Amino acid sequence: MSLRLSSASRRSCPRPTTGSLRLSGGGTSFGTGNSCGISGIGSGFSCAFGGSSLGGNTAGGNPCAGFTVNERGLLSGNEKVTMQNLNDRLASYLDSVHALEEANADLEQKIKGWYEKFGPGSCRGLDHDYSRYFPIIDDLKNQIIASTTSNANAVLQIDNARLTADDFRLKYENELALHQSVEADVNGLRRVLDEITLCRTDLEIQYETLSEEMTYLKKNHKEEMQVLQCAAGGNVNVEMNAAPGVDLTVLLNNMRAEYEALAEQNRRDAEAWFNEKSASLQQQISEDVGATTSARNELTEMKRTLQTLEIELQSLLATKHSLECSLTETESNYCAQLAQIQAQIGALEEQLHQVRTETEGQKLEYEQLLDIKLHLEKEIETYCLLIGGDDGACKSGGYKSKDYGSGNVGSQVKDSAKAIVVKKVLEEVDQRSKILTTRLRSLEEKSQSN
């Protein structure tokens, strides 16, 4: 945006009459008393504010009614209408400045309130008093810890009961195996006993057979003895010259002795065989029983050792499982707390970023408003200089606002002679239409007498 005052032809202006020009804070008017038209200012003076051209809008939204100074002078023509137009434009500028200052004050108040509520070192929600919930939270934490402890104790008791049941089951299985082994040994001994019983029965049968045979021989011998005794009972004497006969008694006695010796020999042989077999069998049984007993004792001891080791292993596994459960629960709790803290940190960072963004935006808006204010002040000063002439002084004490005291903006046109004046108003602007500097340069000024 630019404010240019192009130089036209150098002309002489008669000395204007003395008048006064007053500007007040709001709704002020120009007091007309100047009857001189300054013809030294050519056409081409325009007011452009906020990137608007002649007749455009200001940055605050108020219309900027541009005006053009014609060749006949600044206040030539209808002076009252021109001054009223300038008065209205200046009043609209001041109203816009007041509105912007009020908006700026409102924003500053909001920023101050926000910093008082959510300033550095504070956090959302800390202005509330949650101390009355702390005992309830502690009580709930204690209840949770007690419940966790009781659950762990119940789990340990269940594990111990399961281990005890497993121990009893192992003992039952071991005793059952031992019982089956003893039954197998008893069955084997029963088979041996049956064999011995069969051998004994055979020997008894042989003994009975020999006894019957001996009884039969004794009976025959007795009958023969009776026959011989009956035959010898008569007194028949017969002398015969014959060979001596066989003595039957001696023969029978010899036969009886032979059979008795044979029976005794058989009995002794059977008894010796029976004793020998029984002794060897008893020795074998004793050896087997000793080996079985030692093996059974060793097996029982090994089974007891195995049961003890299995019980210890189950106890260690249960302890390991409970510790793993406790570790998992602790890790899950700490992970949940860490996630909650990270969520809070993320929310606070987002809130801080939002606050910084809003602060930057408000800062930029404040700078824009301040630039607009400075531009308005410079434009008012430029108006005063243009209205008052080269020697006119625009004494401005500011206008009533938050940061500046109230005062009167006035311009006094001093008496001067005819002068040839060439003036230029130079403004430097940037790409965003922001005014950097404003200068009013008087190129040439010469005083002349009437």
From Swiss-Prot:
Head: annotated segments: 1-78
Disulphide-bridged cysteine pairs: none
Primary subcellular site in the record, as a coarse category: cytoplasm
Keyword Phosphoprotein annotated: yes
Region (Linker 12): 229-251
Subcellular location: Cytoplasm
Region called Tail, residue ranges: 391-450
Quaternary organization: Heterodimer of a type I and a type II keratin. Heterodimer with type II keratin KRT5 leading to the formation of keratin intermediate filament (KIF) network. Interacts with KRT6A to form filaments.
Note: There are two types of cytoskeletal and microfibrillar keratin: I (acidic; 40-55 kDa) and II (neutral to basic; 56-70 kDa).
Protein name as it appears in the record: Keratin, type I cytoskeletal 25
